[in-house]
Amino acid sequence: MSKRDYYEVLGVGRDASEREIKKAYKRLAMKFHPDRNPGDKAAEASFKEVKEAYEILTDANKKAAYDQFGHAGVDPNRGGGGGYGGAGDFGDIFGDVFGDIFGGGRRGGQRQAARGSDLRYNLELSLEEAVKGLTKELRIPTLASCDVCDGSGAKKGTSATTCGTCHGQGQVQMRQGFFTVQQACPTCHGRGKIIKDPCTKCHGDGRVEKTKTLSVKIPAGVDTGDRIRLAGEGEAGEFGAPPGDLYVQVTVREHAIFVRDGNNLYCEVPISFSKAALGGEIEVPTLDGKVSLKIPAETQTGRMFRLRGKGVKSVRSHAVGDLLCKVVMETPVNLNERQKELLREFEATLTGESKKHSPKAEGFFDGVKKFFQDLNS
């Protein structure tokens, strides 16, 4: 029998937020949970279906695969028998949402030592650093495994003992009306073990505050918004649990000359009136140094020139962007009398030939003249 759409199972739209998905799961899990429906196989099947949908849609990678490929994208063992994750323990994910309720007859229940928290480091780079790549040394404040007790939390030469209240289960059960309520053990706080002689350095926590230095290779071509994941470089886990990850969030500072758009770079290059009219060669900046750019005669201000391969190498492929140079004609300033006289002489030579030498300007003023004639007619 084919599986139902996971969004349909939870009764949410495909654009539902994680909070909406969690809320829908909580409502349905309460409805179909085996402790509320003892012996009801249909309710048990519905609970498993709801749980499976929740597990997929709250995992970013699995959700992306499901959205693109459907059930085939998240089947862990195509044809391997059993649904996603098998029958599983009803307590595994249900406990994540509901905490300590509905303990019932579920096995175990001991709280596992928590994985270390992920860390985020905001790294600001210059455009040159981002384009060329480099190795950066980062100082990261974190929680590291205690080197005296090796993360156990117990004094050297001793070890944790089984909690006498919950007998190592980490949870105790209480009867409330129709339900058996399972709560974290108040003695060991859900760990199942007691540290009678805590480590003198970490005071029984198993972790200590530390600033560590990491040498991180930043690949060429990174841009603002890119994120680099360093597996296992986050905070140490509790009592030997796996560490979290470190995420380096990249921000590239604005540049005085260049503006980046993807793999392309843009810049404005000022040119003189005479260079624009007569043509010639100018030097333009690139991230690899100056290069020569040929300017054709009669170049208008705002014209864009493309220098292929002078942009940014993509961080995700071998493609290299271009440098686009916009020439901007600069009006001469601080002229002496001789220079002004020459310009007046030049202006006089254009009298009566404006259509020939300035066709756009002439056309514009003809249009303005016609506009006012039509307005007054």
From Swiss-Prot:
One of its GO terms (biological process) is response to heat. Keywords: Chaperone, Cytoplasm, DNA replication, Metal-binding, Repeat, Stress response, Zinc, Zinc-finger. Pfam families: DnaJ, DnaJ_C, DnaJ_CXXCXGXG. Binds 2 Zn(2+) ions per monomer. InterPro entries: DnaJ, DnaJ_C, DnaJ_domain, DnaJ_domain_CS, HSP40/DnaJ_pept-bd, HSP_DnaJ_Cys-rich_dom, HSP_DnaJ_Cys-rich_dom_sf, J_dom_sf. It is found in: Cytoplasm. Residues 5-70 form the J domain. CXXCXGXG motif repeats lie at residues 146-153, 163-170, 185-192, 199-206. SMART domains: DnaJ (SM00271). PROSITE patterns: DNAJ_1, DNAJ_2, ZF_CR. Its main location: cytoplasm. CDD domains: DnaJ (cd06257), DnaJ_C (cd10747), DnaJ_zf (cd10719). A zinc finger (CR-type) spans 133-211. One of its GO terms (cellular component) is cytoplasm. Belongs to the DnaJ family. Homodimer. Participates actively in the response to hyperosmotic and heat shock by preventing the aggregation of stress-denatured proteins and by disaggregating proteins, also in an autonomous, DnaK-independent fashion. Unfolded proteins bind initially to DnaJ; upon interaction with the DnaJ-bound protein, DnaK hydrolyzes its bound ATP, resulting in the formation of a stable complex. GrpE releases ADP from DnaK; ATP binding to DnaK triggers the release of the substrate protein, thus completing the reaction cycle. PANTHER family: CHAPERONE PROTEIN DNAJ (PTHR43096:SF48), DNAJ HOMOLOG 1, MITOCHONDRIAL-RELATED (PTHR43096). HAMAP family: DnaJ. This is Chaperone protein DnaJ.
